[in-house]
Regions:
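Hydrophobic/aromatic-rich alpha-helical bundle segments in the mid-to-C-terminal region
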Residues: 117-125, 137-180
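Helix-loop "lid/cap" segments that line or gate small-molecule binding pockets
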Residues: 92-96, 106-115
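Hydrophobic alpha-helical connector segments
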Residues: 58, 72-102
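Helix-turn-helix
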Residues: 12, 20-54, 58
Length: 180
């Protein structure tokens, strides 16, 4: 019983950390802010995580894993090009731009990677390799998949930076049309 409660509490903390990470990056939110968003006090934090970096890294890797799982759930009959088109249609949408619930964490973190612990860069590198393989039509198509990923991430980051509006919408449409 106690382990279930502890696991549920840990999951609430991770959900709050994930939302904070997407909104403000991994460095800015304090432990107090994350715990408050989870409806908890700071005092219980260290029963679940050894540090703020450990919390944010776990939230980051969970979010990345969810992205890959959503692509794994796509029809296996789709070609890499068709998968990239479907991913781009969602990834470069207003809904994804304006969402913080299950949004991709990369646009919020890519600018901070140089200042984060190496474990973040390692997790990102692994994710990029795995995603490129998922989105490639063949092993020879991996560079095209990497280019499209860079375009989608950069397009979404710019659209989010611009905020909702016509220019932001144009950035999303332009990036989406460039992904082939």
């Amino acid at each position: 019983m106690m382990n279930d409660k502890k696991a549920q509490t840990r999951e609430r903390i991770l959900q709050a950390a994930s939302a904070a990470l997407i909104q403000r990056g991994p460095a800015e939110p304090s432990v107090g802010e994350v715990m408050g968003a989870a409806g908890l006090t700071v005092g219980g934090f260290y029963a679940h995580f050894e540090s703020k970096d450990a919390l944010m890294l776990e939230a980051f890797t969970q979010l990345l894993a969810r992205r890959r799982a959503s692509i794994d759930d796509m029809d296996a009959q789709l070609t890499g090009e068709e998968r990239r088109g479907l991913v781009a249609a969602f990834y470069l949408s207003r809904k994804h731009r304006d969402s913080t619930a299950q949004a991709c964490p990369i646009p919020a973190t890519v600018g901070e990677m140089a200042r984060l612990p190496d474990a973040f860069r390692d997790a990102l590198s692994e994710h990029v390799e795995l995603m490129a393989a998922q989105l490639a039509a063949s092993p020879e198509d991996t560079d095209k998949a990497l280019a499209d990923m860079a375009l989608m991430i950069g397009g979404l980051a710019l659209a989010r930076a611009l905020g909702p509006g016509e220019l932001s919408d144009r950035v999303l449409r332009a990036a989406k049309s460039a992904v082939r």
